[in-house]
């Protein structure tokens, strides 16, 4: 249940951080090698080439929230085991984590709909169209972004973006896939070499019209790290004999917590499509 709302981190490079190893995780982003155009001298080894790598670091941070449930409410509510509160907190945890990932994805490469050069020039007709998808895929290919193992890039949109995409005549709905058992969470369909999932929230910029962000990215474009021992979890705490902050057992608590980090590894491999 706590995982229900997590759409945006799909496709991330995931690396857990063991306890006792500090708060910083390092990833390496390798630069493409020059192409070989000449054969070596017969019978000899080629010259060794140097790998060029950039270290990308991210720091794990704590995130948490909780609510108090009065003893009177817990004794008189129709839902005595607080299932409703647990569900609400679980959804909030998932949506909060999703938002943190989405905000980090905003650090990718911008593509303004309708070939506009300023966000203020985006009009209501500049939607997240099939043509925008084609342009994003072209950019990713030029940047040598890696596709996922299924041969597709991954797209992440919102209700504003999906409305335009699903009206295109070349759109393929997810339920028509031959391999329909291997869907992403929230998958809608695919278009021009991109499989799309939909989240309920969107990064919005208020301008001449409201402008929303959708994303298309390749494999290894961003990373997510969880601290072992403090992964995302919902906690239910009942009054206890040793609880000094609750001396007369007047409340219980329901909350969630996690230690987590997300980081864009290569902004050239994430296209942030800004559209109406």
Where in the sequence are the language-model features?
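N-terminal "assembly arms/tails" that initiate or stabilize quaternary assembly
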Residues: 1-58, 270
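Sequence/fold signature of self-assembling virion shell proteins
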Residues: 1-5, 121-139, 166-276
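Beta-strand elements of well-folded, non-transmembrane domains
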Residues: 31, 71, 258-262
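Acidic glycine-/aspartate-rich tracts in secreted/extracellular proteins
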Residues: 33, 160-163
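Short acidic, glycine/tyrosine-flanked loop/strand segments centered on an H-E-D-like triad
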Residues: 50-77
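Alpha-helical scaffold segments that mediate packing/assembly in large oligomeric complexes
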Residues: 73-145, 160, 275
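Short gly/pro-enriched beta-turn/loop segments at secondary-structure junctions
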Residues: 146-152, 189-191
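Polar-ligand-bearing catalytic/cofactor-coordination segments
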Residues: 155
């Amino acid at each position: 249940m706590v995982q229900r709302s997590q759409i945006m981190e799909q496709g991330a490079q995931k690396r857990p951080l063991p306890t006792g190893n500090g708060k910083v995780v390092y990833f390496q982003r390798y630069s493409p090698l020059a192409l070989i155009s000449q054969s070596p001298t017969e019978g000899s080894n080629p010259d060794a080439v140097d790998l060029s790598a950039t270290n990308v670091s991210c720091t794990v941070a704590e995130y948490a929230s909780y609510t108090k449930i009065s003893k009177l409410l817990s004794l008189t509510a129709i839902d005595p085991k607080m299932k409703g509160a647990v569900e609400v907190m679980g959804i909030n945890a998932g949506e909060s984590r999703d938002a943190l990932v989405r905000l980090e994805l905003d650090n990718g490469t911008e593509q303004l709909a309708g070939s506009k050069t300023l966000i203020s020039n985006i009009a209501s007709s500049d939607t997240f169209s099939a043509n925008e998808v084609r342009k994003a895929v072209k950019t990713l290919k030029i940047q040598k972004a890696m596709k996922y193992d299924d041969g597709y890039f991954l797209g992440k949109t919102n209700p504003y973006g999906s409305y335009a995409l699903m009206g295109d005549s070349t759109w393929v709905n997810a339920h028509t896939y031959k391999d329909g058992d291997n869907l992403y969470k929230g998958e809608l369909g695919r278009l021009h070499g991109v499989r799309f999932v939909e989240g309920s929230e969107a990064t919005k910029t208020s301008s001449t019209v409201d402008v929303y962000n959708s994303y298309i990215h390749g494999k290894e474009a961003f990373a997510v790290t969880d601290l072992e021992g403090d992964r995302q979890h919902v906690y239910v705490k009942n009054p206890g004999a040793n609880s000094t902050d609750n001396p007369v057992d007047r409340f219980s608590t329901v909350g969630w917590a996690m230690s987590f980090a997300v980081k864009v590894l290569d902004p050239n491999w994430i296209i942030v499509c800004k559209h109406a």
